[in-house]
Amino acid sequence: MTVPAVTAPFLASAALLVGAGGAKLWRPDDTARALRAAGLPAHRRLVRLGALAELIVAVASVVAPGPLAGALVAAVYAAFTAFVGTALLRGWPISSCGCFGRPDTRPGLPHLTLDAAATVVATWWAAVAPHHIDRLLTPSPWHGWPLAFVAAVVAGLAYMVWTNPLERAAR
């Protein structure tokens, strides 16, 4: 059996959730402001509870990336896609979605596209994921390190789109 082509993008999506969930757990204020602007419940404890759930799903997906993990990651990104899409359609006054627990970029088309792509990737992974990925990676070249590298690069590029450090530096 070969490693599915969607493995690196899925692991990148899960890794981004680790960072985002951890950041929101640590700094929930910007996410709470975004939820408040949308007219949704926005208490800091509620944001932290959601961030903890996000972090649990993400860590489980990195540690044991099977079909269930893919379905859970897809559900998280589908919720993000719905939130950002609704914010754009309704013109909610959100200056930052708070994805990474601090002011980053305004929700926009790149943000929506990445969330939707991560939803598709995670859904695809849920459909094709092997139950024991370690059995696939052990005989592969360098035990999957090239795959981990590609996942890290994809995650880093997506993080740059979501947080736009150049825009923040110009402020």
Labelled PLM ranges:
Residues 1-171:
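Membrane-interfacial helix-loop segments of redox and metal-homeostasis proteins
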